[in-house]
């Protein structure tokens, strides 16, 4: 039985690298996984996912996945979503449909909360509906476990 996974972590915890490695592992075993990201993620261009360590791969947009008929989605062995915090409720509902009705695993990677520790919309719904929730751990610049993100400007940390 397929499951919906939400793997979250602070910035710099290798979420994107993990997503790319999972897709590679599927491909290496002769399986077909699709990488997707929301259109609001423009960091690396429209149809590419890149990690800070230099890994990259083509992807589709979640919005394209929304338009895809179920029969085409059934051609995938796994759906892997990067930057899932930027998804909206209906997109997360689509992931639930893919898992529950099409029996295809969906693995979502993203931030849990913003710099004010407020949940992103996509993360909120993934935390509510995911079958498996996993934290990807990393270390903060201070040496302790990284649990949240900070936003900086020329004067230091922004708190509002």
Per-segment meaning from a language model:
Residues 8, 24-26, 76, 109, ...:
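Sequence-level detector for tyrosine residue identity
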């Amino acid at each position: 039985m397929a499951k919906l996974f939400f793997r979250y972590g602070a910035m710099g915890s290798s979420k994107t690298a993990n997503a790319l490695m999972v897709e590679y592992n599927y491909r290496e075993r002769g399986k077909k996984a699709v990488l997707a990201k929301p259109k609001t993620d423009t960091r690396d261009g429209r149809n590419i996912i890149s990690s800070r360590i230099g890994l990259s791969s083509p992807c589709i947009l979640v919005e394209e996945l929304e338009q895809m008929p179920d029969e085409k989605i059934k051609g995938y062995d796994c759906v892997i979503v990067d930057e899932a915090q930027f998804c909206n409720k209906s997109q997360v509902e689509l992931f639930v449909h893919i898992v529950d009705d099409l029996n295809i695993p969906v693995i979502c990677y993203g931030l849990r909360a913003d710099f004010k520790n407020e949940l992103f919309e996509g993360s909120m719904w993934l935390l509510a509906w995911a079958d498996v929730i996993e934290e990807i751990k990393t270390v903060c610049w201070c040496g302790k476990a990284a649990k949240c993100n900070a936003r900086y400007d020329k004067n230091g940390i922004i708190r509002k």
